[in-house]
Amino acid sequence: MSYFRNRDIDIERNSMNRSVQERKCRYSIRKLSVGAVSMIVGAVVFGTSPVLAQEGASEQPLANETQLSGESSTLTDTEKSQPSSETELSGNKQEQERKDKQEEKIPRDYYARDLENVETVIEKEDVETNASNGQRVDLSSELDKLKKLENATVHMEFKPDAKAPAFYNLFSVSSATKKDEYFTMAVYNNTATLEGRGSDGKQFYNNYNDAPLKVKPGQWNSVTFTVEKPTAELPKGRVRLYVNGVLSRTSLRSGNFIKDMPDVTHVQIGATKRANNTVWGSNLQIRNLTVYNRALTPEEVQKRSQLFKRSDLEKKLPEGAALTEKTDIFESGRNGKPNKDGIKSYRIPALLKTDKGTLIAGADERRLHSSDWGDIGMVIRRSEDNGKTWGDRVTITNLRDNPKASDPSIGSPVNIDMVLVQDPETKRIFSIYDMFPEGKGIFGMSSQKEEAYKKIDGKTYQILYREGEKGAYTIRENGTVYTPDGKATDYRVVVDPVKPAYSDKGDLYKGNQLLGNIYFTTNKTSPFRIAKDSYLWMSYSDDDGKTWSAPQDITPMVKADWMKFLGVGPGTGIVLRNGPHKGRILIPVYTTNNVSHLNGSQSSRIIYSDDHGKTWHAGEAVNDNRQVDGQKIHSSTMNNRRAQNTESTVVQLNNGDVKLFMRGLTGDLQVATSKDGGVTWEKDIKRYPQVKDVYVQMSAIHTMHEGKEYIILSNAGGPKRENGMVHLARVEENGELTWLKHNPIQKGEFAYNSLQELGNGEYGILYEHTEKGQNAYTLSFRKFNWDFLSKDLISPTEAKVKRTREMGKGVIGLEFDSEVLVNKAPTLQLANGKTARFMTQYDTKTLLFTVDSEDMGQKVTGLAEGAIESMHNLPVSVAGTKLSNGMNGSEAAVHEVPEYTGPLGTSGEEPAPTVEKPEYTGPLGTSGEEPAPTVEKPEYTGPLGTAGEEAAPTVEKPEFTGGVNGTEPAVHEIAEYKGSDSLVTLTTKEDYTYKAPLAQQALPETGNKESDLLASLGLTAFFLGLFTLGKKREQ
């Protein structure tokens, strides 16, 4: 019998008034028998929304456990006085309603807990370790449950003191007789760590004391441990440790857990009993401890920990500072589909201001995908009004596709990575870029070196290879093909192309018959092809970028025989403005050798021209004859992963020095100095730890302000390719750099970029960014001024409501301007004396409340009860918030929850939101066979305060005696892969950093993510979840 049929019978028999019925609709979730849709219909029919109370601890306190004074109170609607009409209910019905309401309570973090096919073994909420309980919460009565687990997850949400001990335990199992038999999840020097030891005292797992991810002292954190028993795929089992939802380290050494510790007797939070000693105590606030009966996946851990993900606080501009809104100059497609012009992706920005004041924005136009191969055109757009408006795209070159390619996704010769520069004397603008024959570019080069050029009678000619022959044919004057013995043939190569985008360059003719193209490599109809090598091409413009010359091959001028790869450091080159080499054009490039290629030989250098671009020369590499770890290296022979430097950006100081800012693998900024215009380099590379390098291209320019000399540098602030930063350095008299400011310029994804000075104290930046489903990447442009660079941004002093949004009938979302967390359910006090009650937390910034329809439009005066905490420890303010749609109640709603008529799941026609996997990409860890640096941890011997009547816990860090995890390879990005799979990694299964997807419901991009997706999901899924949770509790 359906819920609503029962409801009608009750109305007829008892003549209950509407208020009683509304309460039944609110609280009788467990009585639903026809599913969530019935409940939704009921809410619509009766004009009500279920009121959801704050969940208390999911288990009753242990019988032998002292109730702690620090426990948070549980706030429910039972605390309100009841209407007089409800006194007519019988005692049985009152008792039943009380039970119903108790079962209906849902977690304050319902969305984070909504996991499938998993059972809770132990759960403890809202406790503390402090002086009153000896810094320890005893859970020993749960030991038998733990011993039965073969696969498990231990998830803990906690807040340590800002000045916590060097080492403290979170959750542990230990023995009353054997001090070295235990399991502990702990924190060591703010690093989340882990240890398990058997009855013989031997370690189960690898070393976690130098794992990369740290907890935030004095703030809320989550640490999650998973263990999996041995299987065919995991012969020894696996353990993983996560911090705030992100995987910190994996160990495949053992899948042992509590069942493998026969003598353990104690289970505890905080101070740990090890035989006769109590150790590792600290003051902790524990929001939640949950043990599950299986290992959660990385995706599930991210979801369970979603409320603990936080970003840096958004700062405001100081007086006088200007940062324009971004303008998308080259806009990609969305959701994997091409844009209106058939282009899926744009990459590799290059920005140049010409002598006429025109801005030229250059890019890779990647038609099929964002990878570093396939159909890529070199394109530009021009602005003659300082970036306000932009002209149509102009294609410098785009070689034609192979119509019979074996793989169409890579079936084109490749042009990639552009550098723009203008000669101030001739006014000629140069575009220099890489070229590869059909294939995967730098990732598809031949393992065996093929000669690309042959010198004959003092002239250099390009070599052609003919199928089935070993001799070297050559392309000579007018494109005529010559045999290996120097005889002209009937074959002719197009060397002076005339078709649009010069797409016919490389076409091969026999007489007037087109046979194919010498740049094709698969299923080719041409009998010839060029060497599978890398090349450097140049185009130029003599009319301010409006039209461009056909590509010219400058490779033989600058590429030595030993170089496997030679490519540009994309962005903008410079012309030396003073010194003995004044007028010299400098273009950043980097090379690899045939010994170690991308794994150990990438080296930055300069190519230069002293005759206005007619001829080009290669300078020495920064790595040539440099001392590294006591050994002299050279770019032609080196095999040293850590010593590599790759794409770079170049500036000249007023004293004539040339500074090369290089992308590298040290995690910080590396700068080389040349005293001779970029031909040779000082042997010491200066490192600046104030500027992070997350192994991505950067851009730098030289500028003057009020007679003083400065460098402006822009790059991704990390932890991966995200959070664009502009850095300001003062140039000292000796040429050294003093870094003054580091200001954020773009939140979210941020990769390659290019800077230019625009004049009048204004600067421009063209950069890679994506949002709102854009493919990687869209190239966006912004302008900023000197005050933005040189002044500190203003930090927020409180967390406040940014906007409110009506999510459905009787439900409103409050979105804050920074991350918040609910521990004690807040009730909003309204100006009319009524209240709005807390439902649950939707994401890191959004809280859901129920409000009566007649109270919509009311202002919030404060909290009637409960609390909202800032994840950044700021005061939280709700006063003045208006309960209506829009920016803090002042802006009309853009989205409203539609009536749900489709199947359960996502609403409307929108696809489920795409989730992105976060990852840790910091400096720890290595690739290949090289061990990660071993970090030795000194034993802590300092004092600890006494807790209560118990002696102060002894600080004893877990002793690690097994194989150091530092000897195991971890993820490390080596070669730059600019496509959709943007990281090139060398990994082993033993230790790596997983990219787990964002579990929280993403908010649409408007600087911060807003609550539009709430609307698209609707309350349907929410109420369905509540029903499911209620049924689980009933069962």
Curated annotation (Swiss-Prot):
One of its GO terms (molecular function) is exo-alpha-sialidase activity. Residues 1-53 form the signal peptide. It is found in: Secreted, Cell wall. The keyword Calcium does not apply. GO terms for cellular component: cytoplasm; extracellular region; intracellular membrane-bounded organelle; membrane. It catalyses: Hydrolysis of alpha-(2->3)-, alpha-(2->6)-, alpha-(2->8)- glycosidic linkages of terminal sialic acid residues in oligosaccharides, glycoproteins, glycolipids, colominic acid and synthetic substrates. Its EC number is 3.2.1.18. Residues 94-112 have a biased composition (Basic and acidic residues). Transmembrane segments: none annotated. InterPro entries: ConA-like_dom_sf, Glyco_hydro_33_N, Laminin_G, LPXTG_anchor, NanA_rpt, Sialidase, Sialidase_fam, Sialidase_sf. Residues 61-92 have a biased composition (Polar residues). It is an enzyme of class 3 (hydrolase). Residues 1007-1035 form a propeptide. Keywords: Cell wall, Glycosidase, Hydrolase, Peptidoglycan-anchor, Repeat, Secreted, Signal. The keyword Ribonucleoprotein does not apply. CDD domains: Sialidase_non-viral (cd15482). Belongs to the glycosyl hydrolase 33 family. NCBIfam families: LPXTG_anchor, SIALI-17, YSIRK_signal. This is Sialidase A. The lineage of its organism: Bacteria, Bacillati, Bacillota, Bacilli, Lactobacillales.
